[in-house]
């Protein structure tokens, strides 16, 4: 376990990480750190890493940024918490989430997995070359869900239905293990066609999105 970690960055991730480390008895404000952990925007990682004195481990928490951004440090790794963070909540946001650990040596891998476990995360190994594809998958699962919720809300608003009624439905879909239901799963193409007609009449800007998602759902259902 790393006992002295200097956390750089106090955004949503950095504040949660620092709070959890303090909970676990890790010194985050002292001198002579064993690890310098960069919790800064992706665009700032390379510049901040270059300013860190050599010696300790240097790591970042980005999902998309390769380890090369941590040059010139050879003792390096990354731990990406696969979670979405908000300032309204604290370190409990880390509990039980998975974490992608990317490392180039066994020692770095051990350090990364140790950090993840200290934070309350469930580590798995991820190749540096796979980071972009991995991050795209995470964006689908997190950011694009927000986009879909907004699209569904617009249709509810046009129908005179309360958008907040969608939230229990979305939660139950997750709780049910993403089991596919609905008209495409049933092969009810008349209903799908009726959806398209209604969307084209009231929210035409969402028709292409519906068509694309319907095609992807059909592939999933067959």
Describe the residue ranges of each PLM region.
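Hydrophobic Val/Ile/Leu positions in short beta-strands of Rossmann-like dinucleotide-binding domains
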Residues: 5-7, 38, 101
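Internal alpha-helical scaffold of NAD(P)-dependent oxidoreductase catalytic cores
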Residues: 91-175
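Phosphate-coordination loops involved in phosphoryl transfer and adenosine-cofactor binding
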Residues: 2-4, 55, 96
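NAD(P)-dependent Rossmann-like dehydrogenase/reductase catalytic/cofactor-binding core
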Residues: 163-222
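Rossmann-like NAD(P)(H) cofactor-binding subdomain of soluble oxidoreductases
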Residues: 15, 19, 32-91
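NAD(P)+-binding Rossmann beta1-loop-alpha1 motif at the extreme N-terminus of oxidoreductases
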Residues: 1-32
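Short phosphate-binding/catalytic loops that engage adenosine nucleotides
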Residues: 25-26, 74, 121, 161
């Amino acid at each position: 376990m790393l006992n002295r970690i200097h956390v750089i960055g106090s955004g949503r991730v950095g504040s949660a990480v620092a709070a959890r480390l303090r909970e676990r008895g890790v010194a985050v404000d002292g001198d002579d750190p064993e690890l310098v952990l960069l919790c800064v925007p992706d665009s700032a990682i390379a510049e901040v890493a270059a300013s860190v004195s050599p010696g300790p481990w240097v790591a970042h928490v980005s999902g998309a940024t390769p380890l090369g951004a941590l040059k010139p440090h050879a003792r390096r790794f990354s731990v990406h918490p696969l979670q979405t963070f908000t300032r309204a909540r604290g370190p409990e946001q880390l509990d039980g989430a998975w974490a992608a650990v990317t490392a180039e040596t066994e020692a770095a891998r051990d350090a990364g997995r140790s950090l993840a476990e200290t934070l309350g995360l469930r580590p798995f190994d991820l190749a540096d070359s796979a980071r972009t594809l991995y991050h795209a998958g995470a964006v689908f699962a997190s950011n694009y869900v927000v986009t879909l919720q907004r699209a569904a809300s617009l249709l509810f608003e046009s129908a005179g239905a309360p958008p907040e009624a969608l939230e229990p439905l979305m939660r139950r879909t997750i709780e049910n293990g993403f089991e596919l239901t609905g008209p495409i799963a049933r092969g009810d193409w008349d209903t799908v066609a009726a959806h398209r007609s209604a969307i084209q009449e009231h929210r035409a800007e969402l028709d292409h999105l519906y068509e694309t998602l319907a095609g992807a759902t059909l592939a999933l259902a067959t």
